Amino acid sequence: MALSRGIRNNNPDNILRGEDWKGLVRDGQDTDKAFCRLIAPEYGIRAMVIILRRNRQKHNLNRISEIIRRRAHPDKNDTRACIDSVVQATGMPADQLADTGDSGFMTTLLKAIVRHENGEQPYGDDVFARALALAGDQ
């Protein structure tokens, strides 16, 4: 089975190009013109964490339904399917307050998003732990 674009790019949330993320593959080595390509999955997951934290602080997004609607725009995604997938994976109702400041819950949420975006979740807990540690240095 071929790897998904997000897994190949070490960008499991398929973050569009634009921001100068830590760990970006530099021009000349980057073959994807639409999505960021990072040097390791930890850096792609780090970017996910930073985006989730920004959205929580800037837009007060504290529920799975709010978080997913913001990151999976209905014009290009099946937002309901993404919400349902993340709810099932986390075991948390879509409109319950989510503690994204808790590293355990954040890891569960990240794994659910990665699985939905890529059809698989290939990363071990160690990758998520390193990504969360890297996100602390933003």
Protein language model features and the residues they cover:
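Cell-wall polysaccharide-cleaving catalytic domain and substrate-binding groove, primarily
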Residues: 1-138
